[in-house]
Every structure is written in C-alpha cells, then in structure tokens.
Amino acid sequence: NDGSGSVFQSNSLANPHTWREEFTKKININNSKDIGKFDVVVTNPPFGTKIPIDDPVILEQFEIAYIWEKSENGFTKTTRLQKSVPPEILFIERCLQLLREGGRMAIVLPDAILGAPGLKYLRYWILKNVQVLASIDLHKDTFQPKNGTQTSVLLLRKKTKKEKEMEDAKSTIRKYPTFMAMVEHVGHDKRGNLTFKRDEKGNEKVISQKEMVKEESKGKIVEKEIETKTKITDDETTEISLIFKEWKKEQKERYSEYDF
C-alpha cells in the first residue's frame, strides 16, 4: 500500500510513538493516551498462550497488564506488572484506546475470556469501560480447518467519561439489555468443506432462478430463457446480523436512556 488508501501496517501493541510516521502525523498521535480518534474498530486479533507479550515497555501501557486484586466493590489495580499477558487481552484495551467516547468495537475473542475464573478481573474491567451491546457465540468450526478455538464476537460501545463518573459515584455498573446468540451453522465443516441447507427429508434445498442468456442459433444471436438451481449455503451469520438490527431498534424504543 502506498498510503493513498489510508491503510498502514505497524505493531499496534507497541508504543504509538513508534508507529509509522505517515500514520501518526495524519491523525496527530503522540502516545497511548492520545489515540482515541476512531468511531469504529473491527478486529480479529491474534490470540493464544504460545505468543505471550512479556516486554515491560509494551505492558506498562495497559491497565489490564497489571496485577489486579479483589476488593470490596470489585477489583483494584496494583502497581505490579504481570510477567506476561496473552495478546488478545492487550488488544481489548488497545482497541478501546483507539475509540472515541461512544465509539463501537466488534472483536473476536476466545471464549476463555468470557468464562475463565482467573480472568474475573478482566471481565470487571471490560464492564467498567464498555457497554456490551452483543455477545455472539461462534460455532467451533468457524475458523476451521486452520483453527478450532471456540470463540465469540463481542460488540462493545465505549462509555463516556461522564457515564463512568456516574457509575463510580454510585459504586455500581448500570444494568442494560444485551443481545445474545449462538451460531450453530457457519457454511462449512471442520475440514473446510461447504455445507448446505437441507429439508426435513435430508434433501439439499435449492433456489430456482430464471435468467436470459444469449446464444448462437443458425448463424444468429438469439436470447433464451433458462432456469438455474443454486444450493443454499447453511450459514446463520447473515440471519443473526439481521435479527440483531431488529433487536437494536426495539431497544432504542424501550430504553431511550441507553445508546444502542
């Protein structure tokens, strides 16, 4: 990329002052506290315990890279850095840093982040800083045949400074509705082979379409109507996105005090 398309490549976990100059100058970035320039972040970050981040220069940029201790109202950050942190955890905070107040993020994360007992402090931090708009549990074959990790997509909205101050004053986190769904069909199996929808008898469903084509007949070009049949990929992700849009409309009408 020559930069004209505003696409840049850098180690996004490194300190922002080390990012490529044409990028940092374009949006006036100086440090990790000065990167909230974006309205939307969509990401599928690398994850796994085999690629931990252990550079203290990188870790010290992130609140969730520190050790957190259980407290009366949740968890409290200490001044002690963890020895290493999986990259997906750091990417949650980095993406949040990149957002403006009220900005939205869609991020793919391993399910351990949502349920592992040792990561309660992380879930506490997430709920303190964002409104969870949706949690969508993906099928285990979603990234097969390359990766079988069980993952979810989280849709998040960055809370404003005012929102967080109000919650801190009451020592509570506001309750709000969250869209939840499970994707049971993703259009392929664990080997990567396409899967198709079937009827109650097990026959593959098809869509019949008529179209006009041109062909040569007796030295002349004539138009002819033909019927084509196309199998329907068994993928629920598009359907769930449409259901989510309808859900959002309903929530805006019912809960005007929340930003969906």
Label the model's feature ranges.
Residues Q9-N15:
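Conserved SAM/SAH-binding loop
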Residues S6-Q9, A134:
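Short, well-structured beta-strand/strand-turn elements
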Residues N1-S4:
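Short, conserved SAM-binding/catalytic segment
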Residues N15, W19-F260:
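A conserved structural/catalytic subdomain of Rossmann-like adenosyl-cofactor enzymes
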